[in-house]
Amino acid sequence: MATLQQQKIRIRLQAFDRRLLDTSCEKIVDTANRTNATAIGPIPLPTKRRIYCVLRSPHVDKDSREHFETRTHRRIIDIYQPSSKTIDALMKLDLPSGVDIEVKL
């Protein structure tokens, strides 16, 4: 498996912390560029906002509510012309636990 011809690896990352996500993207792009693969990205995708509405009081006062939100930041990185060296380097890469990674070949 020297070189995969006309293939690409699509890496989809998502996290609640934007700075953590950006540092992970930089590590992946640097690793791909060091192994002579072309990395395109990170391409930012729309941020998902999830809002939770909670009653403040445990008893009455339904008019008094509190809103909480979580923001999920997402990025896509495409790696073209990956070699087996590229795949091995990506597998050994140490990324933070707050980042969710999905890889498609």
Swiss-Prot record:
Q: Which InterPro entries match?
A: Ribosomal_uS10, Ribosomal_uS10_CS, Ribosomal_uS10_dom, Ribosomal_uS10_dom_sf
One Gene Ontology term of the biological-process aspect is: translation
- Gene Ontology molecular function terms on file: structural constituent of ribosome; tRNA binding
Q: Which GO terms describe its cellular component?
A: ribonucleoprotein complex; ribosome
Endoplasmic reticulum is among the record's keywords: no
Which key words are in the record? Ribonucleoprotein, Ribosomal protein
Annotated Pfam families: Ribosomal_S10 (PF00338)
Q: Which PROSITE patterns match?
A: RIBOSOMAL_S10
The UniProt record lists the keyword Ribonucleoprotein = yes
Oligomer and partners: Part of the 30S ribosomal subunit.
Record's PANTHER family? 30S RIBOSOMAL PROTEIN S10 FAMILY MEMBER
Q: Which purpose does this protein serve, as stated in its record? A: Involved in the binding of tRNA to the ribosomes.
Similarity comment = Belongs to the universal ribosomal protein uS10 family.
Q: What is this protein called?
A: Small ribosomal subunit protein uS10
What gene is behind this protein?
rpsJ
